[in-house]
Regions:
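Conserved catalytic-core motifs of GNAT/GCN5-like acyltransferases
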Residues: 116-118, 136-153
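Helix-loop element at the rim of GNAT/NAT acetyltransferase active sites that forms part
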Residues: 4, 12, 23-38
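Conserved acetyl-CoA-binding loop-helix of GNAT-fold acetyltransferases
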Residues: 92-106, 128-132
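Active-site acidic-Proline motif in GNAT/NAT acetyltransferases
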Residues: 87-93, 121-122
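Short glycine/proline-centered loop/turn elements that form peptide/ligand docking sites
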Residues: 96, 100, 122-126, 143-149
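Hydrophobic pocket/interface hotspot
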Residues: 21-22, 81, 115
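Acetyl-CoA-dependent GNAT
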Residues: 34-90, 100, 106, 161-165, ...
Length: 170
């Protein structure tokens, strides 16, 4: 996949991206929201061997990697997505909603009729972005999983249909 909007690029992750991905994934500050406050503890060799992987995407701003996205077909004409703007200086800039818009448009164009995702209940910044894009909150799962340290976590489930989609990449 390769999607471009001004200085923003979404592209398929390659084995050469493994060092950057591992740097982010092993950083507890980057991964805490996903339940890994100590990072994943993975290696460049292990991750390079998994790439390219269907649905694993790199986010670039002016050709500089700043984060990653993923998507997968979950059946019933739905795609599940995820995003991390990993470089903190690029957070809170409105880039996430543009990257999400680009991917969502592409997935709807591929015939998916619904996009689903979940996020940590404590991740209110992400919830705000998802709701601006038109996602509807469908469930809150209280204490439904434990993070890497054994702390109970809650999740919010969202769904989006083409009719509700607010495109920020126009």
């Amino acid at each position: 996949m390769h999607l471009q909007y001004h200085d923003l690029t979404i592209r398929s992750a390659l084995p050469s991206d493994a060092p950057q991905l591992v740097c982010w994934w092993n950083d507890g500050a980057v991964m805490a929201h996903a339940g890994f406050p100590l990072g994943l503890g993975t290696t460049v060799e292990k991750e390079a061997a998994r790439l390219p992987a269907p649905g694993r995407l790199m986010l670039e701003y002016k050709n500089q990697p700043i984060g990653e996205m993923n998507w997968r077909d979950v059946g019933e004409n739905a795609a599940e997505i995820g995003i991390k703007i990993c470089e903190s200086v690029f957070q809170e800039q409105g880039l996430g909603r543009i990257y999400l818009s680009l991917l969502i448009k592409e997935l709807f164009a591929r015939g998916f009729s619904r996009i689903v995702l979940d996020t940590n209940l404590n991740n209110t910044r992400a919830q705000h972005v998802y709701e601006k894009l038109g996602f509807r909150k469908v469930a809150v799962r209280e204490n439904s999983w434990n993070d890497q340290l054994g702390n109970p976590q809650s999740a919010v489930d969202y769904t989006l249909t083409p009719e509700d989609f607010m495109d920020y990449a126009v």
